[in-house]
Amino acid sequence: MPGEAGDVVTLWRPVGPGELKLIQDSGMRAFPPRLPEQPIFYPVLSEEYAVKIARDWNVPASGSGYVTRFEVRRSFLENYSVQKAGGSAHLEYWIPAGEISAFNEAIVGEIKVVAEFR
């Protein structure tokens, strides 16, 4: 599977400017809690899919979109199955909102911004 190496799995997440600010406020170490209308946190398995969301969804919705890349301990992700959201390249994990703190604890290193769209 793409993004896998040893004990960690590389994931991506497209974010808008508001979520990026909250990530920056964490020292680039954590994703913010989900809003009440967001019951699931969706990190994706490919940079290509994250770029598509950031460019095609985040930019029209909020004026800019960013792609973040980060590594998560494989042992944490083994508790979740990969979900297909549409096409075969649209793969993501569905992490319940109440488990975002545990997800953040499983992040290894910093969250990096790897692309920006306006």
Feature locations, PLM:
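Conserved NAD+-utilizing ADP-ribose enzyme module
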Residues: M1-R29, R34-Y42, E48-R118
